[in-house]
Amino acid sequence: MVVVETPVFTRQICAFLPDDEYRRLQLALVLRPEQGALVPKGQGLRKLRWGQPGRGKRGGLRILYYWDKEADTVYLLFAFEKSNQADLTSDQAKAIGRLIREELR
């Protein structure tokens, strides 16, 4: 399994998680890439809830990623805190879905 990060994701995740916790996230996705919920209209985009130290899953992060099963690759696209944005808007999901369709498939 290959894990690829977008530059945006790298900046975001470095601000949210210490290195050891980020390694746990990567390992969790390598072991079970299907665990994130599929985002409607997201062209295969998945959203994973990930706890931050001291906050748990509910108040933690949302990790947006795309799993290309055939290429055995997980693309880490965006990370955000639930306290800043609870969910994607329909327009955001469509835009990211377009990116996946045009660039990653």
What label would you give each PLM region?
Residues 27-57:
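A short, surface-exposed loop/turn module that caps and links secondary-structure elements
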Residues 8, 19-20, 24, 44, ...:
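Sequence/structural signature of beta-propeller domains
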Residues 58-63:
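Short, surface-exposed coil-to-beta transition loops
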Residues 67-105:
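Enriched for short, Lys/Arg-rich terminal
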Residues 14-17, 53, 85:
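Amphipathic alpha-helical interaction elements
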